[in-house]
Design a protein with these regions (language model features):
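Active-site lining segments that contact anionic ligands and/or coordinate catalytic metals
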Residues: 78, 140, 147-149, 163-167
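Cysteine-rich micro-motifs
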Residues: 128, 132
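Iron-sulfur cluster-binding cysteine motifs and their immediate structural context
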Residues: 101-123, 133-149
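Small-residue-enriched alpha-helical segments and adjacent helix-cap loops
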Residues: 1-101, 107, 127
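Generic secondary-structure signature for well-ordered alpha-helical cores
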Residues: 4-7, 11, 47-54, 109-113, ...
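A hydrophobic, small-residue-rich beta->alpha segment in the mid-to-C-terminal subdomain
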Residues: 156-195
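Short beta-strand elements
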Residues: 80-85, 150-157
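A generic structural motif
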Residues: 1, 30-33, 87-89, 119, ...
Length: 195
């Protein structure tokens, strides 16, 4: 009776075991820091990989987390595969007016933007975490951010032996995300270790 009831309601059981687990997401869709619709992406990945690959045998569980910004509230880097929204700033120094109180430097939580006295703004790319808060800070358009891209972490783990996932070397576009996730799952199926 229970199985027929949940089938009528479009639900499935069995979210445990050596398979793709239900996809988790932060509230980036409604969060002030969220850079994209995390719920929509999580739903898409959940349908394609949790529901669509439900019978795919894996050597161990495979967890996917979808994070809306570099705050990492859902801890994507501690999952088998984690996605983090990124907005990479493009600095146009020709538009910088060297304002006494640089709005970009004021809003940057990483202190990646600085204004040496009497000079134009300097952006330290190594300090920038691509949170996008600076995107519209400069009233003269010296800094802008393009479309949201995604940092992909692979191989993260939480528990007795913690491992921070390794970020892929390049950010990926939205349309590339499902293919990247699929390749990671298939690689894990072929070469992953049990336990």
């Amino acid at each position: 009776a229970f199985q027929s009831y949940i089938a009528r309601e479009g639900m499935v059981t069995g979210g445990t075991g050596a398979r793709v687990r239900p996809v988790t997401s932060c509230k980036g869709t409604t969060c002030v820091f969220g850079l994209y619709d995390t719920q929509a992406l999580a739903r898409e990945l959940h349908q394609r990989f949790y529901e669509g690959c439900h019978s795919l045998a894996l050597p161990h569980k495979f967890k996917i987390a979808v994070g809306g910004c570099p705050n990492n509230c859902v801890k994507p880097e501690l999952n088998d595969l984690g996605l983090v929204g990124q907005r990479v700033p493009q600095y146009k120094p020709e538009f910088c007016r060297g304002c006494k109180k640089c709005q970009v430097a004021e809003v940057c939580p990483m202190k990646a933007a600085a204004l040496p006295q009497g000079e134009k703004m300097v952006l330290d790319a190594a300090r920038c975490n691509h949170c996008g808060r600076c995107a519209s800070a400069c009233p003269f358009g010296a800094l802008a951010c393009g479309e949201t891209r995604y940092k992909v972490y692979v191989g993260g783990r939480w528990g007795k032996e913690i491992r921070i996932g390794t970020p892929l070397s390049a950010l990926v576009a939205r349309e590339e995300v499902p293919a990247v996730v699929e390749r990671a799952i298939l690689l894990f199926q072929r070469e992953g270790l049990p336990g």
